[in-house]
Amino acid sequence: MELLYVCLVCVFVFLVSLLLLYKKKSGEGLPPGKTGWPVFGESLEFLSSGWKGHPEKFIFDRVAKYSSSVFKTHLLGEEAAVFCGASANKFLFSNENKLVQAWWPNSVNKVFPSSTQTSSKEEAIKMRKMLPNFFKPEALQRYVGIMDHITQRHFATGWENKEQVVVFPLTKRYTFWLACRLFLSVEDPKHVAKFADPFDVLASGLISIPIDLPGTPFNRAIKASNFIRKELVRIIKQRKIDLGEGKVSSTQDILSHMLLTCDENGKFLGDLDIADKILGLLIGGHDTASSACSFIVKYLAELPHIYQRVYTEQMEIAKSKGPGELLRWEDIQKMKYSWNVACEVLRLAPPLQGAFREALSDFMFNGFYIPKGWKIYWSANSTHKREEFFPDPEKFDPSRFEGSGPAPYTFVPFGGGPRMCPGKEYARLEILVFMHHLVKRFKFEKIIPHEKIIVNPMPIPANGLPLRLYPHHHNP
């Protein structure tokens, strides 16, 4: 009897221990929040806040409700914690590939199948080997003239001799043309146009519910990616021939560099791998920049005093150039106020709304337990539109970026840490060259004064930002 009693006590202690362990793993110590509907979680609320033009509402409502800068939810089929604020940004960016790693939804992995064959850390190392020189400021200097030339052609064909234009399709064409030229040395407008339409279909369905049925955005995105990939493989095969025959330079663009770079074992990437990586770069170098350029036009149209200061700065540079003389790196460095304006646009309408990470192990943050495998979402708006980081956050004020600028980890349109966008300086160049030729040629006004903004996944004007143009009476 006594032995039975001891056994029962041992079983009871064991069961209590299991229960306590289960509680820790399944809820106790987790951030506050709810997981929403089965399967969908809170994904529809998360996405619909963007469709309504206020993606920050999903974040701010829950921060206020739970009185916490960390909360749990269920997004895109995954249990997730949302991290908000500068300290959260610092924690995530500082622990990249230690406690967390980049994570993409299944829709992205299915569009880029090669990304599932290696770890996120290995992919990051590969890409940084592939792009050691192209995006460095000293390397980008030699591309300023090419950017200037293409930008002039863009305005000549898409803007000049028109009373009205729709801005967003034009900025998409502009940034895509630049990316094709500088990444692939593809410059023929007909060849670029062949990529452009399927590329738009791909971008719009990339972050979507991964239902692969005919007619769904995800299904259309997969078809578009397959078409683009075949075209890229054709370009890659021809480039290999041209490199072998010495017809092209080994350093003329990213494609040549990728073809000639091997890993530590002497292995070169296959054609499909390179096509996937070029495709990813085209998305990063095209969609985000086109959104940024469109919103720069929007704010310049709404704020005449800001436009006038940008115009004055750019005309001083224009007047220093001889007939037909292209912009140079030194001219870009003089565009300080223009870049402050661009940064304020990136604060108020960041093309990158946020990004996901995956917990590599259990860890604690702000007193909360984050289990291994959970997804973590950081939001740019959690600092960009908070009074404590940017006083009067809805006010357009480029002076925020004068001197030392915003506090660390508060202005994050390009991410941060090891995963910071490698094309940050490239984006600065294409944005400033665009601003130079825009204000040098035109004054303009919005045709729809209160046009709705949609965020899906980047902010875009619902009607494309129709504009009425008033050309300046001087030679551009």
From Swiss-Prot:
Recorded GO CC terms: membrane
Keyword presence, DNA-binding: no
Domain of life: Eukaryota
Catalytic activity reported: beta-amyrin + 3 reduced [NADPH--hemoprotein reductase] + 3 O2 = oleanolate + 3 oxidized [NADPH--hemoprotein reductase] + 4 H2O + 4 H(+)
Tissue: Specifically expressed in roots.
Cellular localization per UniProt: Membrane
Required co-factors: heme
Record EC number: 1.14.14.126
Protein name as catalogued: Beta-amyrin 28-monooxygenase
Keywords: Heme, Iron, Membrane, Metal-binding, Monooxygenase, Oxidoreductase, Transmembrane, Transmembrane helix
Residues engaged in binding heme: 421
Family of the protein in this entry: Belongs to the cytochrome P450 family.
Annotated membrane topology: Single-pass membrane protein
Pfam families: p450 (PF00067)
MF-aspect GO terms: beta-amyrin 28-monooxygenase activity; heme binding; iron ion binding; monooxygenase activity; oxidoreductase activity, acting on paired donors, with incorporation or reduction of molecular oxygen, reduced flavin or flavoprotein as one donor, and incorporation of one atom of oxygen
